[in-house]
């Protein structure tokens, strides 16, 4: 347990083969201190339930993460428990193709949720089982883009249940097909609490200008800018503006190791290369 640690520009893959002996909530990369910085990394093909849980007030920026939590149920890619949320800054990440939550401000099932003051912005999430799970209160969730397969959950969940949750949170300038205050229920039945204005978000539950994916230039080739004249463009919502060009992940080219040579290694042998 220590403070102000930095993990940057690193590539993690094919890890947690058994997901045994992992600490806490079953986490791939875990830190129990505070003010850790995890940025410009790539993670994929992991086994543990949660991928990143790096202590109080984490900064998680410019990472690309996919194909996670393959050996355990539940879980999230970026996981924050209640005490960890204050001062958290989760931004400019690409999170995709996983059946886990993308970014989760977590808390107890029922009872009092004391999670407060996390900021989640300018993230792109696609083909994720619920892109954002916002539990607690006084959070700011803005300029995120969520689209694609949702595994029967809402894309952005600003949770309000049992009469409590997010009454003072701000949710604005997001683009998603399904935004609500419930895991699966509609916006009509479960409207978002706190600072939420329909005209300052694109929510497929109430907007009828096509899916978020259809309004992006070329999302599966990582061009998440809005098409000119689309509703997302006209409202200036989502993670990218027309001229934005930020990229998540490492700043160097990763080339995987070559497979070992099969067969005889002696070039003078009669059976060489057979």
Where are these predicted regions, by residue range?
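Right-handed parallel beta-helix
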Residues: 1-51, 55-65
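C-terminal accessory segments
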Residues: 204-260
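Primarily marks secretory-pathway-exposed extracellular/lumenal segments that are disulfide-
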Residues: 254-274
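Extracellular beta-strand/beta-solenoid scaffold signature
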Residues: 1, 20-31, 45-51, 72-82, ...
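Short "repeat-start/strand-capping" segments in structured domains, especially the N-termini
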Residues: 3, 34-35, 56-59, 86, ...
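Predominantly extracellular beta-rich ligand-binding scaffolds that present long acidic/polar faces
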Residues: 95, 105-107, 111-223
């Amino acid at each position: 347990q220590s403070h102000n640690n930095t993990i940057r520009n690193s590539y993690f893959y094919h890890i947690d083969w058994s997901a045994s002996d992992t600490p806490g909530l079953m986490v791939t990369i875990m830190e129990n201190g505070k003010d850790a910085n995890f940025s410009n990394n790539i993670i994929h093909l992991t086994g543990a339930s949660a991928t990143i849980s790096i202590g109080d007030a984490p900064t998680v920026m410019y990472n690309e993460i996919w194909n996670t939590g393959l050996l355990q149920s539940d879980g999230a890619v970026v996981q924050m428990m209640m005490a960890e949320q204050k001062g958290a800054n989760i931004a400019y990440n690409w999170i995709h193709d996983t059946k886990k939550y993308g970014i989760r401000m977590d808390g107890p099932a029922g009872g009092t949720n004391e999670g407060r003051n996390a900021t989640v912005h300018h993230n792109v999430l696609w083909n994720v089982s619920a892109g954002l799970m916002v539990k607690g209160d006084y959070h700011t969730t803005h300029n995120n883009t969520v689209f694609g397969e949702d595994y029967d959950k809402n894309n952005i969940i600003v949770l309000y249940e049992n009469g409590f949750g997010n009454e003072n949170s701000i949710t604005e300038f997001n683009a998603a097909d399904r935004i609500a205050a419930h895991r699966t229920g509609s916006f009509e039945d479960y409207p978002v609490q706190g600072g939420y204005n329909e005209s300052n978000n694109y929510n497929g539950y109430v907007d009828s200008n096509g899916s978020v994916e259809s309004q992006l230039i070329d999302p599966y080739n990582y061009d998440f800018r809005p098409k000119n004249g689309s509703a997302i463009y006209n409202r200036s919502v989502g993670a990218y503006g027309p001229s934005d060009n930020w990229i998540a992940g490492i700043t160097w080219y990763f080339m995987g190791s070559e497979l070992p040579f099969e067969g005889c290694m002696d070039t003078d042998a009669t059976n060489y290369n057979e």
